Amino acid sequence: MLVAEAAERNKEPILQVLRQYLDSAQRGVRVLEVASGSGQHIAHFARAFPHAEWQPSDVDQRCLDSILATTQAHGLPNVKAPMYLDVTWDWKQWGGILPQSLDLLVCINMSHISPLSCTEGLFRAAGHLLKPKAVLITYGAYAINGKISPQSNVDFDLTLRCRNPEWGLRDTSLLKDLGQASGLLLERMVDMPANNKCLIFRKQ
């Protein structure tokens, strides 16, 4: 199993945000996590929401193996087998997920370590797959209307762009525009530890 220190640190703060948008007692809730990574997040969330159905996904086979091992180790029957998913694919290729069938779509720490086409694909698919009034929640470090702060995030952005010119912190104004193009409105930005944010986009 892969273990990411950052995921251990942020899984509980992110869960506290999710609690504001999911009812732990409600049955039949369907959640897709894009770019699930090690599986630590979805295992933590699935324990907190045992009546929801959680679908993890990733494009990296090592992550898919780790997700399976992590969820099996925790004995989580409400987590489906991890799905291979390239987020740039057309939404109709997203594992047979039906249009307007998801109650929540979660994406943690993907947009800044992937080409912009991945973030564009995420918003396009969310516009089709989320139920009306359902939400897309993204988490990470972002530029806010053209400005990156504090200095640690400026340095982080530079490090990412040195590793891959297609990577880097995405601007919330760009994400707002991508959301609107897919019928998603940026409803809220939540300050998180370590200069990160959760962005809440609601499907109209």
From Swiss-Prot:
Domain of life of the organism encoding this protein: Eukaryota
Acetylation keyword on record: yes
InterPro entries named in the record: DUF938, SAM-dependent_MTases_sf
Pfam families documented for this protein: DUF938
Gene3D superfamilies: Vaccinia Virus protein VP39 (3.40.50.150)
Residues with N-acetylmethionine modification: 1
Matching PANTHER family: METHYLTRANSFERASE-LIKE 26, UPF0585 PROTEIN CG18661
Name of the protein in its database record: Methyltransferase-like 26
